[in-house]
Amino acid sequence: MKKYNKIVLTGASGRLGSYLREPLSKISKKLVSTDKIKIGKTLNNEVFKKLKLENFKDVNKILKKTDILVHFGAYSNEGPFQEILESNILGAYNIWKCAEKNKIKRVIFASSIHSVGMYKVNQTIDHKVMQKPDTFYGLSKSFGENIAQMYWDKCGIECLCIRILSCAKVTSKRSLSTWLSYDDLIRIVIQSIKMKKLGFEIIYGVSKNKRSTI
């Protein structure tokens, strides 16, 4: 199995990031996990770096000599615009600008269904529909997709944008329509890293089931 010299994971203390740490550590010689909040015990080949995404200098320092960047760090809900602006919008700019400076060739980005959240609930949509964000949070994820597209077109930085629906335990039949299992999330991320060619792609993060409108 090929092992990458260095993978950087942002948002490592979050619910989704915490599930990705161990799988990412298995395909890397060194996993650098970052977040504002410290993680628990680190894995054998993992180091933790405290990081605020809005701090360009710190982002640039951490991304030096990085092979793959898995960007799951964000203000993860709707909230005050200033907080979303700093973590999600300025943070996304810092991520891609520093990826360019450090010659990182591939980014895996946690986008959200909220980037297209204004479509009707029963309307079937695909990855080609126009963005219709429903919140400032969704707007920030739309920005992340757009800056990823720009850096692919201008600089050749590959990116998979995963529009995650809901990656949590199933609590009802209705919740199956948006459910992404943790195992499927891990498979998406790992396979997108291993792909020989990726380019720029947007996919929906949802597990296969009959109730989904995606």
Residue ranges, per PLM feature:
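Glycine-rich NAD(P)-binding loop of the Rossmann-fold in SDR/ketoreductase-type enzymes
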Residues: 54, 83-94, 131, 139-142, ...
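NAD(P)H-binding glycine-rich loop region in Rossmannoid oxidoreductase-like domains
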Residues: 40, 51-87
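Conserved glycine-rich Rossmann-like NAD(P)H-binding loop of the short-chain dehydrogenase/reductase
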Residues: 28-40
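N-terminal Rossmann NAD(P)H-binding glycine-rich loop of SDR-like oxidoreductase domains
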Residues: 5-27
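Catalytic helix-loop patch of NAD(P)-dependent Rossmann-fold dehydrogenases
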Residues: 86, 120-159
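Flexible, glycine-rich beta-alpha linker
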Residues: 136, 157-177
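Alpha-helical substrate-binding/gating segment
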Residues: 164-169, 179-201, 208
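Conserved Rossmann-fold NAD(P)-dependent oxidoreductase catalytic core, especially the SDR/UDP-sugar
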Residues: 94-132
